[in-house]
Amino acid sequence: MTEGFNTQRDEKTDSRHNLTWHMMDINRQKREKQMQQKAFTIWMSGLSGAGKSTIANALEKRLYAMGKKTMLLDGDNVRMGLNSNLGFSDEDRVENIRRIAEVAKLMNDAGLIVITAFISPYRHDRENAKQIIGDGFREVYVSTSIEECEKRDVKGLYKAAREGKIAQFTGITRDRKSVV
């Protein structure tokens, strides 16, 4: 469990912050029944340029064509909005993944199928995401060689990291084995 955070929502109050969890009459199960689908999250991780966003987008299009209610959460998009105040320090990466997991959980509770595409390099962060999201968490690692990722790098991030212009870049200045 993340420190100071109730990932299972089994406690009805948080006396430290004077909070009470309110149970709603229309719950996840009722929403799933109405939408005729089971809500879950597909959590895609892998290096920058591995193809996470491309695969996630193709999957969402396929599910949408089948009449499924979906939402795609992409790393760059979320960092430009909800997580625009976060950098790439270890602490900020943990918070980035925690917030994304919380959003995915809320969307699952709304009956949606959620597809995420984030580097999410640390196993402990993905485990925390799994705790927050619960049983509907499905992890997919998009395995692509560092060489192929560099070839696909339209943003020039790998080059900049190799030149020392980007600190803490997964796969270059951070251990890429931690992603698996």
Residue ranges and their predicted role:
Residues 96-126, 131-132:
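Charged, well-structured alpha/beta interaction segments
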Residues 143-146, 151-180:
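Small-molecule kinase domains that catalyze NTP-dependent phosphoryl transfer to phosphate-bearing small molecules
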